[in-house]
Amino acid sequence: MTLVPMVVEQTSRGERAYDIYSRLLKERIIFITGPIEDQMASLIVAQLIFLESENPEKEICMYINSPGGVVTAGLSIYDTMQYIKPKVSTLCLGQAASMGSLLLAAGEPGMRYALPNSRIMIHQPSGGFQGQATDIEIHAKEILDIKGRLNDIYVKHTGRDLSEVVANMERDNFMRAEKAKDFGIIDKVIEKRLDIGVE
């Protein structure tokens, strides 16, 4: 059982209690923590759309600490990040692996960050199927199609050649924050909040 801290604020109407994530959402901060799956992705998408409706001009900050997860769930978050009007900055704390690294790279150019001890990992998608031979063949074609789409997304956001992306994603490829910057997944490694926007 996970305990979520509560924050109590004084208002003109008295005290108001929020769970910590709801309070941070008021500051336009969204957390992606843990495995990416459908229910979690729906909550993230809803938060992005809600914050756009609140103020379509104001930046949204996305903090990522995720081992990755379901590709289609992650792509629903990715597509929403690209779809909405506000700029979405991304920050890796802990790890951004697999689909987590794709979301990290998908932040607004110039606004993709990682803390110094973050770990970023990219790789090709994986899947396991059983059943009739024809069904296995269908699923194999689907996963190859998804692999191609993910490669294209990394090419778009890193500026790397397709051949470079394919070679780097052949197996689990772990990177320190500085290497992720060199690869183009992030724009800057930051140690303090004040470092954001400072060159």
Curated annotation (Swiss-Prot):
A single MF term (Gene Ontology): ATPase binding
Classification via InterPro entries: ClpP, ClpP/crotonase-like_dom_sf, ClpP/TepA, ClpP_His_AS, ClpP_Ser_AS
Keyword annotations: Cytoplasm, Hydrolase, Protease, Serine protease
The keyword Transcription belongs to this UniProt entry's keyword annotation: no
Location(s) in or outside the cell: Cytoplasm
CDD domains noted in UniProt: S14_ClpP_2
EC primary class: hydrolase
Superkingdom of the organism of origin: Bacteria
Pfam families assigned: CLP_protease (PF00574)
Subunit structure: Fourteen ClpP subunits assemble into 2 heptameric rings which stack back to back to give a disk-like structure with a central cavity, resembling the structure of eukaryotic proteasomes.
Function noted in UniProt: Cleaves peptides in various proteins in a process that requires ATP hydrolysis. Has a chymotrypsin-like activity. Plays a major role in the degradation of misfolded proteins.
The protein's name: ATP-dependent Clp protease proteolytic subunit
Taxonomic source organism: Ehrlichia chaffeensis (strain ATCC CRL-10679 / Arkansas)
